[in-house]
Amino acid sequence: MPTLPPLPDWVALEHQVAHLMTKQELHGWYFNERAAWQLASALQKELEETKKVLRERHPFVEGATFNPKRNNKTQGYFQGCESVRLKELNPTSRDHIAWILSTFYGWKPTQLTTTGKPVIDETILMETASAGITIAGDFAKCLDITKKLGMISEGTNAWLKLCTTASRVHHHCSVGCATFRMSHKNPNLAQVPSDPRFRQLFVPTPGQVMVGADLAGIELRMLAHYLARYDDGRYADILLNGDIHQVNADKIGIS
């Protein structure tokens, strides 16, 4: 029987990572369900209050145009008299948001989707609010709270839906991306908001201590580690003491 060659270092390392991630998934995160329900309730209340303010200001948006072909006294239609059917404002509808901003505040979109619709996201709305259209900030707030409620209680993979009777959340994490970065699912705990109200939901198991680490820039730090044998630590020095992004920009002439 032929002897198989030894595994390359990177394969052995990936296997070790897979082993650690499996242990993490089986162990799970201890989750404060009571605090999570309280936070979800508070966010829901805040969302409804914000929606109420927006609907009081703009109750309706423009719907479909209707041109009756004949008179209808019961419905109040008259042949040839075009009318517009109104829809109740949905403060989390991007189409409704774009219509309100452009119709009443003269907003001009700077980005369009592939289908030609204005791009509406929290970043654009906050920039619009900073430019003087303050109501855009309320729309951004609605989108943000809706997203957070999806994480906690309402989404398919909401934390509270996946929390076990033992108050644990067992999320899956693996080197699953084509770029060899980590992928997270069921639920995605890599996107927990930095807001302390959310971070405090994940607590140490009683009798244990939770230890955390800041992994900002982890990919470049790992690259610097493996480059050190070839560049005597030059890349690591730039990364830690300089601005690696500016160095890269200078190299390709886009400074």
Language model region names:
Residues 93, 133, 229-232, 243:
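Short, solvent-exposed helix-helix connector turns and helix-capping sites enriched
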Residues 1-197, 203-209, 216-219:
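Conserved "right-hand" nucleotidyltransferase catalytic core of DNA-directed polymerases
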Residues 240-255:
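Generic long, charged, amphipathic alpha-helical segments
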Residues 57, 104, 226, 251-252:
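Alpha-helical structural context
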Residues 61, 229-234, 252-255:
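Secondary-structure transition/capping motifs at alpha-helix termini
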Residues 221-223:
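Cytochrome P450 core scaffold surrounding the K-helix E-X-X-R motif
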Residues 48, 106-113, 227-241:
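Cytochrome P450 catalytic domain signature, combining two hallmark sequence patches
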Residues 32-33, 121, 231-234, 243-244:
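Poly-acidic low-complexity segments
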